[in-house]
Amino acid sequence: MKKRLYIETLGCAMNVRDSEHIIAELTQKEDYELTQNLQEADLILINTCSVREKPVHKLFSEIGYFNKKKKEGAKIGVCGCTASHLGEEIIKKAPYVSFVLGARNVSKIRDVIKQEKAVEVDIDYDESTYAFSDFRTSPYKAFINISIGCDKKCTFCIVPNTRGEEISIPPELILQEVRRAVDTGAKEIFLLGQNVNNYGRSFSDKARKVDFTDLLRMVSEIDGVRRIRFTSPHPLHMDDKFLQEFATNPKICKSMHMPLQSGSTKVLRDMKRGYTKEWFLDRAMKLREMVPEVHISTDIIVGFPGESEEDFADTIDVVQKVRFEQIFSFKYSPRPLTPAKDYENQIPDEVASRRLSYLQDLHLQMLDSISEQEKDKVYEVYFEELKPGGYVAGRTDNNWIVKVKGSEELLGEFKSVRITKPGRLSLEGELVG
């Protein structure tokens, strides 16, 4: 009888892909099968995020809950970015945890499950040529890593300390994985990296000198690929070559994540982001000009140390000019191992909270007018998910979530949809034809 694996995934799309790799290793090469029932699992894994402080604080209460609910003899393992930076401390605080596996050590999962109190958190471990097995949480799209780690030194970010220096995965391995995904039914390819458009800079072999724009073109030339998405690009590397490929390649989805973080050049300098307010606006407005239908999302941190009212006003100015379709906004969260946590002039929580509320309220007002303009437009929607009430949901090329009345027969299909009911976060429509 097979052992049962329960896994909970927190955080970003890269964690989703890491969990897929773990599941593949254990279900295809070890005697495990996946379960959604915590209490019947023989192995319980939590794949963690450490970008902000709150999820880290929740970790120990969560694994304590798992320990109470698990069946006798079941093992608990902690994986991911929090595992990388806390390491042995996790087992010291929670001795019922069987092992700790860092974000850069996914390929070691089969070894650590056979050890007691193993801690594998080497952020210099090279997984770039590791031949991951096939497993996808969605039959309709494939998450594919194109790089591992990050070579940026943003002063607020712990990721370089949990995922290590950036290494680009060889293009031939990426294309091989894309072909396998297409052969097993995926029509949408989602390329992943901390800074995808920095791809290729780690290659020392000149014969392999491929940048992200080249890689996009190569992926798009594979038969069976209908759509290409990617996250997360860095504004600093949004050169004209990249924007031109984005605008003209019909397989590249017209949605772009542009992490602003702050609209103040002074704050951006303190964050070590490498660009200015003016650079960001130039890239965003050029993108709007080249691709009028583009959907631009962003990340914004408010309350970064030293952020004045004038600095915050600069952020609001960028928001009003770019009119982002989606904003992921947060109060600054001091992280261990980052320079910004020791900066002077930390912003009081009540000030950061006020700024966050103002930003979020402003964006909600914008969304009302942005979404209203979608009414009566016709989009091609790729349906991926059943929703309550007899609805099926999918995404447009430019990343609107659209739901229509329908059945599971729509799943995995591209259909034309006329938008009948705009909404802030999603649209409703009806099938055309």
From Swiss-Prot:
> Which PANTHER family is this protein grouped with?
CDK5 REGULATORY SUBUNIT-ASSOCIATED PROTEIN 1, MITOCHONDRIAL TRNA METHYLTHIOTRANSFERASE CDK5RAP1
Assign the protein's first listed, main location to one coarse class: cytoplasm
Q: What does this protein do?
A: Catalyzes the methylthiolation of N6-(dimethylallyl)adenosine (i(6)A), leading to the formation of 2-methylthio-N6-(dimethylallyl)adenosine (ms(2)i(6)A) at position 37 in tRNAs that read codons beginning with uridine.
Outline the extent of the Radical SAM core domain.
136-371
GO molecular function list? 4 iron, 4 sulfur cluster binding; metal ion binding; N6-isopentenyladenosine methylthiotransferase activity
Which Pfam families does the UniProt entry name for this protein? Radical_SAM (PF04055), TRAM (PF01938), UPF0004 (PF00919)
State its Enzyme Commission number(s). Answer: 2.8.4.3
How is this protein named in the record? tRNA-2-methylthio-N(6)-dimethylallyladenosine synthase
- Assembly: Monomer.
Q: Which UniProt keywords apply?
A: 4Fe-4S, Cytoplasm, Iron, Iron-sulfur, Metal-binding, S-adenosyl-L-methionine, Transferase, tRNA processing
What does the Swiss-Prot or TrEMBL cofactor note state? Binds 2 [4Fe-4S] clusters. One cluster is coordinated with 3 cysteines and an exchangeable S-adenosyl-L-methionine.
Question: Residue ranges of the MTTase N-terminal domain?
Answer: 3-118
Example GO CC term: the record gives: cytosol
Q: Which reaction does it catalyse?
A: N(6)-dimethylallyladenosine(37) in tRNA + (sulfur carrier)-SH + AH2 + 2 S-adenosyl-L-methionine = 2-methylsulfanyl-N(6)-dimethylallyladenosine(37) in tRNA + (sulfur carrier)-H + 5'-deoxyadenosine + L-methionine + A + S-adenosyl-L-homocysteine + 2 H(+)
Q: Which NCBIfam families match?
A: miaB-methiolase, MiaB/RimO family radical SAM methylthiotransferase
SMART domains the UniProt entry points to: Elp3
UniProt entry tagged with the keyword Iron-sulfur:
yes
Which cofactors does this gene product need?
Answer: [4Fe-4S] cluster
Q: Which family does it belong to?
A: Belongs to the methylthiotransferase family. MiaB subfamily.
Q: Where does [4Fe-4S] cluster 2 bind?
A: C150, C154, C157
Which residues are involved in binding [4Fe-4S] cluster 1? Answer: C12, C49, C81
Query: Where located?
Result: Cytoplasm
Top EC class for this record = transferase
